[in-house]
Amino acid sequence: MVKSARQGAGGFWRDFKDFILRGNVVDLAVAVVIGGAFTSIVNAFVAWLMAVLLQPVLDQAGVSQLQDLPLGLGELVIAIINFLIIAFVIFLIIKAIEKMQRKKAVEEEIVAEAQPDPVLEAQTNLTDSINRLITTLENQQSSSQ
């Protein structure tokens, strides 16, 4: 009973290890870490953007900070700007990846076209061999007559 429980636990840990070592789980973990760091960068950029570009407008409107707008509109504006920046950067990254994938697909297609079809090549070799054999047999028959 104890031995089977150990085997079950070993199977569980082995399955867990296999799950963790899958490429997509590791990729997801890396993406989460990079996403967190990128969010910090975007937040700092938006804070700078607010200070440099929007603060003069807010001062003229009599608002000291964007967060002071009624009904939490300032935080909503900041969240929308953060979202738009992050969405734009992700869009650019996806476009770059798609471009690289298209380029790779074209290169693979060119390589595939350059390589002869092994089945067709084998059929050609067999046909040539059969034709040589027929010629040899015909020559032997004609020389024996």
From Swiss-Prot:
It is found in: Cell inner membrane. GO terms for cellular component: membrane; plasma membrane. The keyword NAD does not apply. GO terms for molecular function: mechanosensitive monoatomic ion channel activity. The chain crosses the membrane at residues 30-50, 74-94. It is a multi-pass membrane protein. Pfam families: MscL. Its main location: membrane. The keyword Transmembrane helix applies. Keywords: Cell inner membrane, Cell membrane, Ion channel, Ion transport, Membrane, Transmembrane, Transmembrane helix, Transport. GO terms for biological process: monoatomic ion transport. It comes from the Bacteria. Homopentamer. Channel that opens in response to stretch forces in the membrane lipid bilayer. May participate in the regulation of osmotic pressure changes within the cell. Belongs to the MscL family. This is Large-conductance mechanosensitive channel. It comes from Synechocystis sp. (strain ATCC 27184 / PCC 6803 / Kazusa).
